[in-house]
């Protein structure tokens, strides 16, 4: 504390003046070394010294391994009882669309009704006025994913044969019964791709076979399969029984032989879209691209010292359990023969809108087990201590001696200390001869206290002795003030681009607009004659942006025309805006461990600290109970980004995780190098989202061979991650070969860019019109930007299916055109078909190596001062310093009063006389 305390040195048994922990002796002549006095209180603290320089940071520690899997969580509550299955109704005629009502419970699909004849073409109305946006709806709670099913073996892919001729349409056949599901064959080598054959017509969908009830559970908790039975009335779900102990997985059965491929039959007419097929397995991963140049390593200046981190937060709950396997789906029937095309009839009457029958709501799934918590990584190496700061200013000067306190009680006799230095001999008189010993008197009363002598002059401090052994480490004191922040380090070389961040949170839906008014109906025009083929003109210059037109009112949909003949494929349109971000998929398995970076240069070694003896290890405390889940905290303010460190070599990319929902559209990222395919590991627990990393440099990877794999099963939706940083725009690809000259069309009128219209109400579906003539003309000028996404309109009447023309051979790839302006979101498409049954989930792969440790985050604010620490234990006494200069001789105090008489002394020795008797008495002479 700005000075040294020599109070532990042996002091002579003489009067002492106390001053702030320092003792000044008043000599009374040379004598033997006295007892060691008690330790004085600590001196006043000196001013704090300036901040020392920060030492270089230590190397990061190796990442830890993943811990064992956690215990399975408790079973969830039983599901709700389903309703009664509704009867299977006939399909009604399409009615006029009403206002969208509440969605009813879905019933069984009804039988398809007879297809009506197309009606006359309706008059196209004026567009209606845009409505105001409504209030956004609340996002519903997300359900828990079920248990994941086991993955089946991959089927073999045979060689692609030559394309067969297009057969004539055959008569429609009856739907066949669902055949037995064949065994999956072994994985074969991918054969060479044959020439692309003409596209066959799509057959009519077969009637799905009835789904049988689930089979009894197999031995050791394995899921069994029962025979497909007729659907019965669903009873109320029972309480979930105790979970069985999963038994060992049996060996895979022998794979049956693959049947011969029959002759291709005649192609049937194009029917309605069939059910969604089961997803195939993923194809092999392409070879890794060539690595870019390794960045040069530059050592920046040392950053400011980081605060000591507190205890880590509790790990997030693990991933949900696996979903059970789904039942078998019925096989589609054989395509029927195409019947003769009927004559167009009169438009049918509009029937009432069909209602959905009541369906059975499924029982709620039980929550899966909590995944394993990640193991704590190994501690990093201890950094080198920084250079010692300059010494602080010395403490205040020694104060004047205070008044002497009352004398304390006598201490016990201590061991004799080492003799002090010989003092200067005073002017002492000669000593006379010793007198006879007198009787020992009683101790007299204590004399009055003499006045304190003047403090002697301060001696010159001697050289410091060797430091003694360090005492035991005291308890931790309150934290000191934070040091000054050091200068920012130089920006290091740019590191390789990191993997894309998780998808951002899904935005809330926009406000629903108010209904607009319908405009007056316009007159229907007659189709004009087919124009002659014009000569294609040269590419015109881009015109200036026109004035924004007034917002038109939304018109009613005109009558739907019959599908025309298939035209030549047009040029690819501009890429639309990305959809709103869906929920992110679960964290993919960790990629293989990257190669270690170059070891940093060793910083200057600091002075060696004094090593204290190790304290006794404390007993581990009892494991605390798990607390309740607290409310979600708000995101804190992002601190300043620290300096970018030097880039190590980039590790290979890990295998792709399950696909998450579509996120917000960012600019196209840079194409990274494909990493070597690692073995897929089990999904680890979702980590805490870190701050966004710096954007990586633009790299261009070599294009790998096109893999042809079957589509893998979709994984369960993962947790929503924060929006990752936008990558730099990618480089344009090489130009392709020129395509064939397309048919010429009539020149289109260049329209002004339309204004971005508001979302309109769903229009009324018109009647189906006759197919119009196929126009031929050059492609028209580019239209304006897409408008906002509109509400889904009602489904119109299905027109008659036109004859499908033969597909022409694919032409060579044309030269890639200039990148167009990104279009706005187009109108929302019609809702898709029924969701297919989930495919069987794949098995967990081997656990991947942990990824590299990310850069350290910005320095957080200083924490609150802790409570003051307890006094440390007494340290070991230091080495004995040299004796100080002898103080001046004090003045003698006044004599005390005479003491009381002492006790009688012992009898003296005999004087040599003799005894004699006289008149009966004895006398001694």
Swiss-Prot record:
The modification 4-hydroxyproline is found at residues 10, 13, 42, 48, 317, 332, 335. It is found in: Secreted; Secreted, Extracellular space; Secreted, Extracellular space, Extracellular matrix. Glycans are attached at residue 103. The modification 5-hydroxylysine is found at residue 103. Transmembrane segments: none annotated. Residues 1-925 are annotated as: Disordered. Residues 35-74, 154-171, 281-291, 363-379, 479-496, 508-518, 551-595, 602-622, 640-650, 671-680, 719-753, 761-771, 791-806 have a biased composition (Low complexity). One of its GO terms (cellular component) is extracellular space. Residues 897-907 have a biased composition (Pro residues). Prolines at the third position of the tripeptide repeating unit (G-X-Y) are hydroxylated in some or all of the chains. It holds the Pfam family Collagen. InterPro entries: Collagen, Collagen_superfamily. It comes from the Eukaryota. Keywords: Extinct organism protein, Extracellular matrix, Glycoprotein, Hydroxylation, Secreted. Its main location: secreted. Residues 22-34, 271-280, 306-315, 423-432, 519-528, 660-669, 696-718, 772-782 have a biased composition (Gly residues). PANTHER family: COLLAGEN ALPHA (PTHR24023), COLLAGEN TRIPLE HELIX REPEAT (PTHR24023:SF1082). Type I collagen is a member of group I collagen (fibrillar forming collagen). These protein fragments were extracted from an ancient mandible bone collected in Haiti. Belongs to the fibrillar collagen family. Trimers of one alpha 2(I) and two alpha 1(I) chains. Interacts (via C-terminus) with TMEM131 (via PapD-L domain); the interaction is direct and is involved in assembly and TRAPPIII ER-to-Golgi transport complex-dependent secretion of collagen. This is Collagen alpha-2(I) chain. It comes from Acratocnus sp. (strain SLP-2019). The lineage of its organism: Eukaryota, Metazoa, Chordata, Craniata, Vertebrata.
């Amino acid at each position: 504390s700005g000075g040294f305390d020599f109070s532990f040195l042996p002091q002579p048994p003489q009067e002492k003046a106390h001053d702030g922990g320092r003792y000044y002796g008043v000599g009374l002549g040379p004598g033997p070394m006295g007892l060691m006095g008690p330790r004085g209180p600590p001196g006043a603290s000196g001013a704090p010294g300036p901040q020392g320089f920060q030492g270089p940071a230590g190397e990061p520690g190796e990442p830890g391994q993943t811990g064992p899997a956690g215990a399975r969580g408790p079973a969830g509550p039983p599901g709700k009882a389903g309703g009664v299955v509704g009867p299977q109704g006939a399909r009604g005629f399409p009615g006029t669309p009403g206002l969208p009502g509440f969605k009813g419970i879905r019933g069984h699909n009804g039988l398809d009704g007879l297809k009506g004849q197309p009606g006359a073409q309706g008059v196209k109305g004026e567009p209606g006025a845009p409505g105001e946006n409504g209030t956004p709806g609340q996002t519903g709670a997300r359900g828990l994913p079920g248990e994941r099913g086991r993955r089946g073996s991959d089927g073999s892919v045979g060689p692609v044969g030559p394309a067969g001729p297009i057969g004539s349409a055959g008569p429609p056949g009856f739907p066949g019964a669902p055949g037995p599901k064949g065994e999956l064959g072994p994985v074969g080598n991918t054969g060479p791709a044959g020439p692309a054959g003409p596209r066959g017509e799509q057959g009519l969908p077969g009637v799905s076979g009835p789904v049988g009830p689930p089979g009894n559970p197999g031995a050791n908790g394995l899921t069994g399969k029962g025979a497909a039975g007729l659907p019965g009335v669903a009873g109320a779900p029972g309480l979930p029984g105790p979970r069985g102990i999963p038994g060992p997985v049996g060996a895979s059965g022998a794979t049956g032989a693959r049947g011969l491929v029959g002759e291709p039959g005649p192609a049937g007419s194009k029917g309605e879209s069939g059910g969604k097929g089961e997803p195939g397995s993923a194809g092999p991963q392409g070879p890794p691209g060539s690595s870019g140049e390794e960045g040069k390593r530059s050592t920046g200046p040392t950053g400011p010292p980081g605060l000591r981190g507190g205890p880590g937060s509790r790990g997030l709950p693990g991933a949900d359990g696996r979903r059970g396997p789904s039942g078998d789906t019925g096989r589609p029937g054989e395509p029927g023969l195409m019947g003769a095309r009927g004559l167009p009839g009169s438009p049918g009457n509009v029937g009432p809108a069909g209602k959905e029958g009541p369906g059975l709501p499924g029982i709620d799934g039980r929550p899966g087990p909590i995944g394993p918590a990640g193991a704590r990584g190994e501690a990093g190496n201890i950094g080198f201590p920084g250079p010692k700061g300059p010494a602080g200013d010395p403490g205040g000067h020694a104060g004047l001696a205070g008044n002497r306190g009352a004398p304390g009680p006598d201490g016990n006799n201590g061991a004799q200390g080492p003799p002090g230095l010989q003092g200067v001999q005073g002017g002492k008189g000669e000593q006379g001869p010793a007198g006879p010993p007198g009787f020992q008197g009683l101790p007299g009363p204590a004399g009055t206290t003499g006045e304190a002598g003047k403090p002697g002059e301060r001696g010159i401090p001697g050289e410091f002795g060797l430091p003694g052994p360090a005492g035991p480490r005291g308890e931790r004191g309150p934290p000191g003030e934070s040091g000054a922040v050091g200068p920012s380090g130089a920006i290091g070389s740019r590191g390789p681009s990191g993997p894309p961040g998780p998808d951002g949170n899904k935005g809330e839906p926009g406000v629903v607009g108010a209904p607009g008014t319908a405009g007056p109906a316009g007159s229907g025009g007659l189709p004009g004659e087919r124009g002659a083929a014009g000569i294609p003109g040269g590419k015109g210059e881009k015109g200036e942006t026109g004035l924004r037109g007034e917002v038109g009112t939304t018109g009613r949909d005109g009558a739907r025309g019959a599908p025309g003949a298939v035209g030549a494929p047009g040029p690819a349109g501009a890429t639309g805006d990305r959809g709103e971000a869906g929920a992110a998929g679960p964290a993919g398995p960790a990629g293989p461990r990257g190669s270690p970076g170059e070891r940093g240069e060793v910083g200057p070694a600091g002075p060696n600290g004094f090593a204290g003896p190790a304290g006794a290890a404390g007993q581990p405390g009892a494991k605390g109970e798990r607390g309740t889940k607290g409310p979600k905290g708000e995101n804190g303010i992002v601190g300043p980004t620290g300096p970018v460190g030097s880039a190590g070599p980039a590790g290979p990319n890990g295998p792709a995780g399950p696909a998450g929902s579509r996120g917000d559209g960012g600019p196209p990222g840079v194409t990274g190098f494909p990493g070597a395919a690692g073995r897929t590991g089990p999904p680890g627990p979702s980590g805490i989202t870190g701050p966004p990393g710096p954007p990586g440099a633009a790299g261009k990877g070599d294009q790998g061979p096109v893999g042809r794999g079957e589509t893998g099963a979709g994984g369960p939706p993962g947790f929503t991650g924060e929006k990752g940083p936008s990558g730099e725009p990618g480089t344009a690809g090489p130009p392709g070969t020129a395509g064939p000259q397309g048919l010429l069309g009539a020149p289109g009128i260049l329209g002004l860019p339309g204004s971005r219209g508001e979302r309109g109400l769903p229009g009324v579906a018109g009647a189906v019109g006759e197919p119009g003539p196929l126009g031929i003309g050059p492609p028209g000028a580019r239209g304006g930007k897409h408008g906002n996404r509109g509400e889904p309109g009602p489904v119109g009447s299905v027109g008659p299916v036109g004859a499908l023309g033969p597909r022409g051979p694919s032409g060579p790839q044309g030269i890639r055109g200039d990148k167009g302006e990104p279009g706005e979101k187009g109108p929302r498409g019609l809702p898709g078909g029924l969701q297919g049954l989930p495919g069987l989930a794949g098995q967990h792969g081997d656990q991947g190596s942990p990824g590299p440790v990310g850069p350290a985050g910005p320095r957080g604010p200083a924490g609150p001062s802790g409570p003051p620490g307890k006094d440390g234990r007494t340290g070991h006494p230091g080495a004995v310093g040299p004796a100080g200069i002898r103080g001046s001789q004090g003045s003698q105090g006044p004599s005390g009063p005479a003491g009381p008489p002492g006790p009688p002394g012992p009898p003296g020795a005999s004087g040599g006389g003799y005894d004699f008797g006289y008149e009966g008495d004895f006398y001694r002479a």
